[in-house]
Amino acid sequence: MLSCICLCSTRLFSPNPIARALKSNSKLNQTQHHHHHQQKIFLCTSRSNLSVTAMEAPPQTEQPYNNSFEFDGFLSNKPYNPPSWASHLNPIPSHIFSLGHFPTPIHKWNLPNLPNNTQVWLKRDDLSGMQLSGNKVRKLEFLMADAVAQGADCIITIGGIQSNHCRATAVAAKYLNLDCYLILRTSKVLVDKDPGLTGNLLVERLVGAHIDLVSKEEYAKIGSLELTSLLKEKLVNEGRKPYVIPVGGSNSLGVWGYIKAIKEIEQQLQSGNSEAGFDDIVVACGSGGTIAGLGIGSWLSKLKVHAFCVCDDPDYFYEYVQDLLDGLQGGVNSRDIIDIQNAKGLGYAMNTTEELKFVKEIAEATGVVLDPVYRVVMTFLVVITSGKAVYGLMKDMVENPTKWEGRKILFIHTGGLLGLFDKTDQMMPLVGNWRKMDIHESIPRMDGTGKMF
């Protein structure tokens, strides 16, 4: 038997339709609930087919986002109180917009061929919600709260053609009834062509993001700051109020997303969800914001971060993270709190056959699908996982097994599943075989004829 509660409307709706429908009476009791004509919930039960019963909606009127009523705090703009150990940082964000589903779970990850007495745990930030937006949600909760506070009516951000951050930003903007403008970097031979609907592009275009393409050469020559400034100036001249989010959402405000995540991990450890403490934090580094937040948070919490960069080089990230930490008046040297190693392989979002084969093997062995953009690397406690990072870690475990013996490691799975859809041609030779099932024509049906199932 299958059961579902169906809420639907014959009209188009904007974010939080349930809240809008119930706003007039948040204490609606069960009797009123059954008799009020415009507010009905139907339980539909069927053995094989689920029927959908329509709920009549109130007349639709366009209004700006209103968060005066919400369920479980989702899509609400709340005052933010930092952890006590981070209260000296400055500036401290005043508000946080609840966009994700937190805390994300932690569970054991049974990776094959681990060194003796090595435990690996996985924190599932890939389950943070917002259309598989992974770790990007944490940064956007603070950035979007700031955009709303500044009265923005649209968002600008920039990244690669398969940027997880850009896709997450496009979704978050629509949650809040804001337009989104994306500047996406691609090859010079494709910059004048339709970018298609593969992976993140499909979601971005479904939610109505405005896409401007630039070549990698233009991006390198002009830079992300100037490109976003040019688009911002254009929109301001059109009477818009744009809010610019940098590459990866990585600035001193976005860093708070993973300062908050460290507090979340602390609380999960205190509740006994992991059965033990961890030794260090290991992350894959793409734009710097995540490792900066984890770095300052873990340093204040007495942990150390080991980061594996998937683009640029370690020195670049040390300097970039230092700028972010200085922006928070953290009073700490980036090289004292994080250990950055190179794991970019062919480069950001580029993979060798060996790396993709590894992603497939991990999925087959554990059921966990990794992002191919970031390499799987492991060192000590918390690893932000993606394909490239874990690959590097497992390789280091084979080459230096004594380094890992007895270690307790936490991987943070940062999401990015949609990036795999841009790798289908490379993945095709690596996935399992298929065949047509051999069925003899004379085999009779055992449960009669004319049934669908």
Model-derived regions: residue spans:
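PLP-dependent amino-acid enzyme catalytic core
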Residues: 2-33, 38-453
